Each structure stands twice: as C-alpha cells, then as structure tokens.
C-alpha cells in the first residue's frame, strides 16, 4: 500500500493471478516476480529512500524487477549460497551467479541475496551496474512467454545505499517466496479452469454416433470430476486469501495450498 500501489486485498491479488494464468502461465509468472519477489522486499525491508525511488515506477511497469536467490548448485538449500558481497568502504563488491531467474534479461533491477560477512543480505542491483550481466537461457519446453535468465556478478560494484537494511538471514527471501507461492496457488486454478473450458467445448463439438460426446455419461462423469476438483482448489485458495488478509496465516498454509492446487492444474 502506498508508493503508487493500490493496496488491494490478498484475495484481489489472488484473483488477478488466477485470471492471468487462465490466459498464460508465463504472464502470471512475470506478475508474481514483479510484485512478490521484487517489489515486496523493497516495500517490507527497504529504506524510505529505496521505496520512494523504485516502487512508484515498478508499480506502473516503468521499471521491471527480478529476484536472485537460486544458484547452479544451491536451489533447495539456499543457506549454502556461494554468492558473496564484500564491504569496500564506500561500496560493496558482489561476486557469484544466480540461475533460472524469471525476468532477468529484461529487468531494470534485481533484488539479489548474497552473503556479507557470512550473513545473507539483500541488495538492489541495477542493470547498468559495472560487473553485472544477465544472459537469457534458451531452449525451454514450456513457459516460453516468460524470460528466464542467469545473473552473473563479476566484481559488481554496488553503492552502499542499495543494501536492504530491514532484514538479515533467510527470513528475507523466504518471506518473498511465501507471497509468490500464494499467487501460484491461485494461478494454478486459472490454468485448470482454462483446461476445463477447452475440454467442455471439445466435448460439445465432437460428434460420435450422431451425438456430441458430452451427451455420454462417461464424459459427463469426467467433466464433473474435473469441475469438482477445480472448485475445491479455488475454495482452498479463497480460504487462504482470507487468512492472509486477516493475518492468521502461517507458511505451512501457503505450501499446502500450492502443493494441492498445482497438482490439480497438472492433472487437468
């Protein structure tokens, strides 16, 4: 809320993710990274100067952000990340690499997590910072509308005022991931709804034995099962959204909703 942002509820955010992914998972992925992984840490952990400088332009889409946590050898174990920041007096030097980064090549800034004196800290890296590059990764089999990149830091010089002052340790990136997973739990429902609508349209238009196959009980049963499971997933996402809005959620709620709903999306 504030800094050019509308301050919508979590349920409203979830519904937006659902409808975006109903159209294309890559579009929802872009929005999740921009809001949950790039804007959120600046809003929650950044200084007032950082918030005022970046958030209004990110809210309008003038600036695109990305999130650098995962490394080639450290995905599920980010606490052992290799990327390091060194305090050089009037600036930091960043060295390392991040992998499979959504929006990386097109981003104007990256929120990067690195170890400074053994403690994980967040840094805002701008695309023109010396020593920073973001080559695009190609040859993907899916999510082709979403840009995926590597982030490379070779003595990347970061001004002192670009460290996020409000958090230390894995709480920072994990807080961001919780918000992104919340959006994914809704987005998966949208993907499943799109599959259901396509299936229903096909069943109504495909003629066998002189009748649409939708008139056969076996097909009706399959469609009913699909709609039942999708509706249950949406109710779970809505319940989670209410808990997010009233502040009674815990991280396990988000993980369980994402686990259930992406399975529904995959199965359909």
Residue ranges with predicted function:
Residues 80, 128-160:
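Flexible, small-/acidic-enriched active-site or ligand-binding loops
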């Amino acid at each position: 809320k504030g800094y050019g942002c509308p301050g919508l509820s979590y349920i409203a955010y979830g519904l937006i993710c659902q409808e975006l992914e109903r159209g294309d998972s890559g579009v929802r992925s872009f929005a999740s990274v921009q809001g949950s992984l790039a804007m959120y840490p600046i809003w929650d952990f950044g200084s007032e100067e950082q918030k005022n400088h970046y958030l209004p332009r990110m809210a309008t889409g003038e600036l695109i952000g990305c999130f650098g946590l995962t490394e080639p050898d450290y995905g599920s174990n980010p606490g052992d990340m290799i990327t390091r920041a060194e305090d050089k007096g009037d600036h930091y030097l960043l060295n390392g690499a991040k992998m499979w980064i959504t929006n990386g090549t097109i981003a104007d800034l990256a929120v990067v997590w690195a170890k400074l004196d053994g403690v994980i800290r967040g840094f805002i890296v701008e695309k023109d910072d010396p020593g920073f590059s973001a080559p695009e990764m190609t040859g993907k089999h899916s999510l082709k509308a979403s840009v995926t990149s590597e982030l490379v830091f070779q003595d990347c010089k970061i001004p002192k005022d670009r460290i996020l002052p409000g958090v230390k340790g894995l709480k920072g990136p994990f807080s961001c991931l919780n918000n992104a997973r919340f959006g994914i739990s809704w987005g998966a429902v949208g993907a499943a709804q799109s599959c259901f609508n396509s299936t229903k349209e096909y069943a109504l238009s495909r003629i066998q034995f002189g009748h649409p196959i939708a008139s056969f009980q076996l097909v009706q049963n399959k469609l009913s099962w699909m709609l039942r499971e999708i509706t249950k997933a949406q109710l779970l996402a809505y319940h989670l959204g209410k808990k997010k809005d009233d502040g009674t959620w815990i991280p396990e709620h988000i993980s369980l909703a994402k686990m259930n709903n992406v399975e529904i999306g995959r199965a359909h």
